[in-house]
Amino acid sequence: MASLTAALATPAAAALLLLVLLAAPASAANFTCAVASGTTCKSAILYTSPNATTYGNLVARFNTTTLPDLLGANGLPDGTLSSAPVAANSTVKIPFRCRCNGDVGQSDRLPIYVVQPQDGLDAIARNVFNAFVTYQEIAAANNIPDPNKINVSQTLWIPLPCSCDKEEGSNVMHLAYSVGKGENTSAIAAKYGVTESTLLTRNKIDDPTKLQMGQILDVPLPVCRSSISDTSADHNLMLLPDGTYGFTAGNCIRCSCSSTTYQLNCTAVQNKGCPSVPLCNGTLKLGETNGTGCGSTTCAYSGYSNSSSLIIQTSLATNQTTACQRGGSGRSQFARSMWSMSVISFHMVLIIICFL
């Protein structure tokens, strides 16, 4: 390997290289997956582009997503061109499919990186992939016995960290986040709408004051509730956080998420070759709502099947917005309180009668 030969040209350079490799952590992150092995879901990393580039180049570099899904993951307009510029040092969410195996989550056989002249595994891990992965993890994933021996044009699977675990029983999308200079867990949690205690527990952090720059955190982002069936091929892939959108069912369905409702909003895309979308109860089109307030129902996307031909499924969904759920919970709690007060009052009356 040319880079290794150059590095070992002098004893001093060889010693420096050895120190760098020994100092590198064996694991960039410890993302656990408690779900069944083989489970897949949507995850992402928050990538910082070291140089000026374009969205099209990022799609090609990571090869884990399409341009429409990359734009959706970052809340950018649908019509944004692949040539649109990405400034140096700006951050972009890169979505990918996560697969859980043996209590560990890693990107599902992608991205694939082709070794270039002068490349080394540590440089690939740090400079190309923001140190979301270590050279040891790349070597292990590709069955490379000697990390110093890789060849130009060799293809490498880069195992990015991820998870498909739920958080307190709710679906989330796990974002791999690299801690910036001077950042703390409280500010990071507030930025992404999670509690600091959740962030600390998820990342097994006992002392938040010891957070280090470049440390990789698992940030479980809240996602919109959906009506997608567990039997649908995309039931774990449409995990959309606030302000994002995505395409599914052969790009025939577009779904978006907003924190105003936290309820997945899906509409049909009028693409050539897309099948007709069934009405709900014979009257409501996909995305249409009947009624108002917490008693309203919406024709929701519930998945697709594609055994012989693409079939899109819909179903009626009740209003599951946060406001309505809180209202229902509040009313139930109020009713229980009133019942308790009635029982207490009744017993007080009996006690008073006994003393008369």
From Swiss-Prot:
InterPro entries for the chain: LysM_dom, LysM_dom_sf
Name recorded for this polypeptide: Chitin elicitor-binding protein
Originating organism: Oryza sativa subsp. japonica (Rice)
Binding site for chitin: 50-51, 117-123, 142, 145-152, 155, 182, 186, 211-213
Main location: membrane
Gene (UniProt): CEBIP
Pfam family, one: LysM
Domain LysM: 111-158, 175-219
Location relative to the cell: Cell membrane
